[in-house]
Amino acid sequence: MPETAEFELTTQLAEFLRTHHFGKYRGLVTDVGDPEAIGRIKARVPAILGDELETPWAMPALPFAGPQHGLFLLPEVDDGVWIEFEGGDVSRPIWSGCWWARGQVPSPAGEKQRLLATSAGHQILIDEDADEIRVTHPGGGEFVIGASEITLKLGACELKITASEINLNNGMVKVTAAGASLVNDAFKIGA
């Protein structure tokens, strides 16, 4: 009798493992238009579903989330994502991160640089080597915060702020504790 129970248990375990999938699988995003707007995506996972079928809405696995706070970043259609299945159940997918193919890593990408880059070209770069935070707009605007200087650029205009002065367009306008000067000292207010 015990042999029958062991055989039955082994059969049940084999069936469970045949119908459940554990671990991470490469996927490609097919849809990000989540009707519930909670960060879900759909993806093709060829290793599990073949090349044509997509997952049901996959829940995100996020570093933090709560009522009206958290990190909300979605991949785009055709981006590579890692897909897992809750309890191994294919009907309950989770997207747990993204991956780049060779040549897809955005620049700059260094060991001490933390970059958030959108496909439209917007960037937030935290650069520990340069000791600065840089926000860049694809239209040319740039905002740089350094330890001793803050710079705002747009086209030919540049505003620099330091602990001792505010400088607009390389001295066209300067404001210091002593006063202000306009057009390279042609007009002064103060001492």
Question: Where would I find each of the regions flagged by the language model?
Answer:
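Hydrophobic packing positions characteristic
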Residues: 2-164
